[in-house]
């Protein structure tokens, strides 16, 4: 019986060990205190609903309440930390929820909603994963964050420049000569550079279009794999990361005038068993897509009917013009209707 209880405790800790935390939020977005688990695949829907966008499926999660529909946040900042199930954040100022079914997710749907609704205002959309050298910048982010270090070589060079985190953060047991430590510190440098670059362009935080920031940090995970989670380096890195996240949340929250949502997702490891796996195209047995059995219509762009009508009526007008021209030429009398023949006959008479 005792063995069964221990096994169940480990199973529950494995399923609900990860966390979804709200570091900062305005008064118009209400997050309730509670221990309600949130599925990992629904985190993008939480971000979309908090910004006032609609989602495909209703979210029956009591953690997010209905706030002020006429006063939505100007920005959503989501930071995902890999390699740890939770961080020792200061109690009271942070609202945390258990995260179940930790599967990989992205905020592409939220970014698409921003692009479609605010295409003329060019909002800031920044999605960055420094450890994977993956960056996605659209709109005004291309001009604001063009000097942001995104590759591993750029991040390493940035650390050894002036005003870097190496000169201000207490490294303790971390070393500036270790590649794993430098990767972790470079991610903290990215957080500082984002808030610093945005502070130089404060007008972007005051426009009417919402902004989106999505950051994936894997440096702490690499330190845990290299030194071990019981090592002094891992404990020091966790403390440094907590302080850096708190400062980054305060900076982004203040830059947007207290009208920004800063969210944190801590995931020890993703559950790959819940991820849809791809199949080899050379396999003889193929699974047919269920959606194709219903003969669903293709999703066209909203500008398609406008362009279609323009092309259709222009082609109809050209066809009618061609028919009328051919009919008149076919029934034309060369001696009477043609100026060329008429002038030629007059010239002949005069001669």
Curated annotation (Swiss-Prot):
Motif Mediates retrograde transport to the ER: positions: 347-351
GO biological process: lysosomal lumen acidification; pH reduction; positive regulation of canonical Wnt signaling pathway; positive regulation of Wnt signaling pathway; proton transmembrane transport
Pfam family, one: Renin_r
Tissue distribution of the protein: Expressed in the brain.
Recorded superkingdom: Eukaryota
InterPro entries with a match to the protein in the record: Renin_r_C, Renin_rcpt
Residues the record marks as site: Cleavage: 276-279
Protein localization: Endoplasmic reticulum membrane; Lysosome membrane; Cytoplasmic vesicle, Autophagosome membrane; Cell projection, Dendritic spine membrane
Record keywords, A-Z: Cell membrane, Cell projection, Cleavage on pair of basic residues, Cytoplasmic vesicle, Endoplasmic reticulum, Endosome, Lysosome, Membrane, Phosphoprotein, Postsynaptic cell membrane, Receptor, Signal, Synapse, Transmembrane, Transmembrane helix
Extracellular side: 18-303
MF terms in GO: signaling receptor activity
Transmembrane segments: 304-324
PTM comment text: Phosphorylated. Proteolytically cleaved by a furin-like convertase in the trans-Golgi network to generate N- and C-terminal fragments.
Leader sequence residues: 1-17
Topology versus the membrane: Single-pass type I membrane protein
Disulfide feature: none
GO cellular component: autophagosome membrane; axon; clathrin-coated vesicle membrane; dendritic spine membrane; endoplasmic reticulum membrane; endosome membrane; external side of plasma membrane; lysosomal membrane
Cytoplasmic side: 325-351
Assembly mode: Interacts with renin. Accessory component of the multisubunit proton-transporting vacuolar (V)-ATPase protein pump. Interacts (via N-terminus) with ATP6AP1 (via N-terminus). Interacts with ATP6V0D1; ATP6V0D1 is a V-ATPase complex subunit and the interaction promotes V-ATPase complex assembly. Interacts with TMEM9; TMEM9 is a V-ATPase assembly regulator and the interaction induces the interaction with ATP6V0D1. Interacts with VMA21 (via N-terminus); VMA21 is a V-ATPase accessory component.
Functional summary from the UniProt entry: Multifunctional protein which functions as a renin, prorenin cellular receptor and is involved in the assembly of the lysosomal proton-transporting V-type ATPase (V-ATPase) and the acidification of the endo-lysosomal system. May mediate renin-dependent cellular responses by activating ERK1 and ERK2. By increasing the catalytic efficiency of renin in AGT/angiotensinogen conversion to angiotensin I, may also play a role in the renin-angiotensin system (RAS).
Protein's recorded name: Renin receptor
Gene name tied to this protein: ATP6AP2
């Amino acid at each position: 019986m005792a063995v069964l209880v221990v096994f169940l405790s480990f199973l529950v800790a494995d399923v609900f060990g990860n966390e979804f935390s709200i570091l900062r939020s305005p008064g118009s977005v209400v997050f309730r205190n509670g221990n309600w688990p949130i599925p990992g695949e629904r985190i993008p829907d939480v971000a979309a609903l908090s910004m006032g966008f609609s989602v495909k499926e209703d979210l029956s999660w009591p953690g997010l309440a209905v706030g002020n529909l006429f006063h939505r946040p100007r920005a959503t900042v989501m930071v995902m930390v890999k390699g740890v199930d939770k961080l020792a954040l200061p109690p009271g100022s942070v609202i945390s929820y258990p995260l179940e079914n930790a599967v990989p997710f992205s905020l592409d749907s939220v970014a698409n909603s921003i692009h479609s609704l605010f295409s003329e205002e060019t909002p800031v959309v920044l999605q960055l994963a420094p450890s994977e050298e993956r960056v996605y910048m659209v709109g005004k982010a291309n001009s604001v964050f063009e000097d942001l270090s995104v590759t591993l070589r750029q991040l390493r060079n940035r650390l050894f420049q002036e005003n870097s985190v190496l000169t201000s953060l207490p490294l303790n047991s971390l070393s500036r000569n270790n590649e794993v430590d430098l990767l972790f510190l470079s991610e903290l440098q990215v957080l500082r550079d984002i808030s610093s670059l945005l502070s130089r362009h404060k007008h972007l935080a005051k426009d009417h279009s919402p902004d989106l920031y999505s950051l994936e940090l894997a440096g702490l995970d690499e330190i845990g794999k290299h030194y071990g989670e019981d090592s002094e380096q891992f404990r020091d890195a966790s403390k440094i990361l907590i302080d850096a996240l708190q400062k980054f949340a305060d900076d982004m929250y203040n830059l947007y005038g207290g009208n920004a949502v800063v969210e944190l997702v801590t995931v020890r490891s993703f559950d790959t068993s819940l991820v849809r796996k791809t199949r080899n195209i050379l396999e003889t047995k193929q699974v047919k897509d269920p959606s194709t059995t219903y003969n669903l219509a293709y999703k066209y762009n909203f500008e398609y009917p406008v362009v279609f009508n323009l092309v259709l009526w222009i082609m109809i007008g050209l066809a009618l013009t061609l028919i009328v021209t051919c009919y008149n030429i076919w029934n034309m009398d060369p001696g009477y209707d043609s100026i060329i023949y008429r002038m030629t006959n007059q010239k002949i008479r005069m001669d």
